[in-house]
Amino acid sequence: FITAAFGIPQISTGDMLRAAIKAGTPLGLEAKKIIDEGGLVRDDIIIGMVKERIAQDDCKNGFLFDGFPRTLAQAEAMVEAGVDLDAVVEIDVPDSVIVDRMSGRRVHLASGRTYHVTYNPPKVEGKDDVTGEDLIQRDDDKEETVKKRLAVYHEQTEVLVDFYSKLEGEHAPK
């Protein structure tokens, strides 16, 4: 809704990383290993990708970050680069709900169609509604991986709420 209303692109580091993984780039291969183990890709890689992306023409009138920044270093790098934010939104969801939602997700890789075993099940269990092909659970949606990612979130990302609430001056969210 926001991207359509303002005519701006959504910038998702997760989508950018998945595209690199699918393409089999060196960054993609490195990222896949880290993500599959429940870790976060190094800040320097993410920051570089984001800076490159927001320099593109379709971002000249703005953009919507999705899942970025995730660490204090990423947030500070954006401030240092002069990237001003109009607003920062935190969506607070209990860990148990996140684990349930992510670990129940199933994907048809060829099309990207996404299902959920409880909330959006396919017509035939484990099969894509359109093609009848198998659905898979991505490695990063497996319960133990989701729990590891949540632990990393609590350690590295929760501090951003405090960072943005205290940010002052020209770079503070308006």
From Swiss-Prot:
Region of interest called LID, as start-end residue ranges on this chain: 104-141
Record pathway: Purine metabolism; AMP biosynthesis via salvage pathway; AMP from ADP: step 1/1
Record-level GO cellular component terms: cytoplasm
Keyword Membrane found: no
Domain of life: Bacteria
EC number in record: 2.7.4.3
InterPro entries for the chain: Adenyl_kin_sub, Adenylat/UMP-CMP_kin, Adenylat_kinase_CS, Adenylate_kinase_lid-dom, P-loop_NTPase
Binding-site positions, AMP: T13, R18, G39, L40, V41, G67, F68, P69, R70, Q74, R138, R149
Annotated ATP binding sites: R105, T114, Y115
Gene3D superfamilies named among the record's database cross-references: P-loop containing nucleotide triphosphate hydrolases
Chain's role: Catalyzes the reversible transfer of the terminal phosphate group between ATP and AMP. Plays an important role in cellular energy homeostasis and in adenine nucleotide metabolism.
Domain comment, as recorded: Consists of three domains, a large central CORE domain and two small peripheral domains, NMPbind and LID, which undergo movements during catalysis. The LID domain closes over the site of phosphoryl transfer upon ATP binding. Assembling and dissambling the active center during each catalytic cycle provides an effective means to prevent ATP hydrolysis.
Stored NCBIfam families: adk, PRK00279.1-1
Protein name: Adenylate kinase
Origin organism lineage: Bacteria, Pseudomonadati, Pseudomonadota, Betaproteobacteria, Neisseriales
